[in-house]
């Protein structure tokens, strides 16, 4: 048999998966121990104060690139994060990158500099476990969360 520790269910997704991450949180706020929405397009103006209050106690780590031309951070993740903080969220984090560049050393542009990807591809940093805040890494942080609700 397969056993799932229901106190350690983490949800995350990139782009539309980030939208679905937020939707799952809004609809099931007591189910998840942590969440990591990446370049999520759940436009903040469609998020009510009641929705913010419903999810403010869920540990969350947002990731985005400022130059994302697909999902504009100024109308999506940034105001949502600010509203969560204002509502009293205690365990929220955000990794903000100016752009998305290759960090593997494998891909270079014509000038030999790290290749710059589309700014929407900030999941590259997430999936390479390069999202950090004060020595804390996203996946170590997420794995340490336990849902006692």
Spans of model-derived segments:
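Gly/Ser-rich "nucleophile elbow"/oxyanion-hole loop immediately N-terminal to the catalytic nucleophile
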Residues: 1-15, 31
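Glycine-rich nucleophile elbow surrounding the catalytic serine of serine-hydrolase chemistry
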Residues: 13-23
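Residue-level signal for short, function-critical loop segments
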Residues: 15, 41, 66-68
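A conserved short beta-strand
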Residues: 30-42
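Short, proline-enriched alpha-helix->beta-strand connector loops that line the catalytic pocket
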Residues: 54-60
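C-terminal catalytic histidine-bearing segment of alpha/beta-hydrolase fold enzymes
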Residues: 63, 69, 85-149
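Conserved alpha/beta-hydrolase "acid-adjacent" motif
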Residues: 69-76
